[in-house]
Design a protein with these regions (language model features):
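Catalytic machinery of carbohydrate-active enzymes
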Residues: 1-318
């Protein structure tokens, strides 16, 4: 069995697709499953129980799908022959006019039979988001009520995480201060107020600050560094699979509606997440260890005492 999944999006978008990929793997445990999408995100599932190969969706060949003449896909070209080698194609790419479905139909894919093509809207309309992507598989007889994403770091991932933290285990608190969007980001000073209180409560725990591209300026901000607890490790530039292993060593993740938050939840780390304009019913990772705090679209309306209380609850349970 060969399966191709077309799924774009950022890091969090991939992680919320994992329950659907898990359904495919459970139904066809020995299938060869490939994905065309964001390779830096999809590496989380590559050779880690979900995917056997990943293709960057921005490669020129993928632009042939759904294209008009003279760039339209031809049945006799090698790319078309390769696509036709799959028995099942799941499309989560936008296809408003059905052009991608048309091309796969030209290659002999139907709604049933020896070559099956299933298309589903790219934008979730069912909460949580993972449920939306699982719904695409219902015509195949696949269904679930478990929408929690799960990641499985390898021994190499864990070794890399241990080297980054200079420890083989222990209890850490992870904090990702950014979100990629100012409207989704709780003020840094408020986070620092929470962290100082937690540091006083839990002197034995190390703070791990995770910085992405959007927060790179904080790494060089000496004033901010002075505000952090003494036992603080600042990490930047780690690939997603190493982040997953790092979060396995953490008892709490503090952050927002971000890809790293979804990764942390997927390895079982308890999370306290501050939400603003995005709906946590749709975008917060589902699960009992997740506390999503929100008061409407203004992220600033969430208070320091609320976040501190949620963090203390999470740490008290771990």
């Amino acid at each position: 069995m060969k399966i191709l999944v077309l799924r774009g999006g950022a890091l969090g978008d991939f992680v919320v697709t994992l329950p659907a990929l898990g359904l495919l793997r459970k139904r066809w445990p020995h299938a060869w499953i490939e994905l065309a999408g964001n390779p830096s995100a999809a590496r989380l599932g590559l050779c880690r129980g979900y995917l056997d190969a990943v293709h960057p969706q921005h490669e020129a060949r993928w632009s042939r799908l759904g294209a008009d003449q003279p760039y339209a896909l031809r049945v006799d070209e090698p790319f078309a022959s390769w696509l036709a080698s799959f028995e099942l194609v799941i499309n989560y790419w936008p296809d408003p006019d059905g052009a991608i479905a048309r091309d796969f139909g030209m290659l002999g894919f139907l709604g049933s039979g020896s070559r099956i093509f299933v298309s589903h809207p790219a934008k979730p309309v069912t909460a949580p988001a993972a449920a939306h992507f699982c719904e695409a598989l219902r015509p195949l007889g696949l269904a679930t009520n478990d929408f929690e994403s799960r990641l499985f770091p390898t021994a190499a991932d864990r070794a890399a995480a241990g080297a980054r933290l200079s420890l083989a285990g222990g209890r850490c608190i992870a904090w990702h201060p950014g979100s990629g969007s100012p409207g989704k980001t709780w003020p840094v000073q408020r986070w620092l107020n929470v962290i100082r209180e937690l540091a006083a409560d839990h002197l034995e725990r190390r703070l791990v600050v995770i910085l992405g591209q959007a927060e790179a300026h904080l790494e060089a901000n000496e004033k901010r560094k002075d505000d952090l607890p003494a036992h603080t490790t600042v990490l930047a530039g780690d690939p997603p699979e190493v982040l997953a292993a790092i979060f396995e060593l953490c008892s709490l993740f503090l952050g927002h509606d971000t890809g790293p938050a979804h990764i942390a939840a997927a390895v079982g780390c308890r999370c306290v997440l501050v939400f603003g304009p995005t709906d946590p019913a749709m975008w917060a990772p589902p699960g009992p260890g997740i506390q999503a705090l929100r008061h409407g679209d203004r992220v600033d309306d969430v208070s320091v005492p609320e976040v501190l209380a949620a963090a203390r609850r999470a740490l008290g349970e771990h």
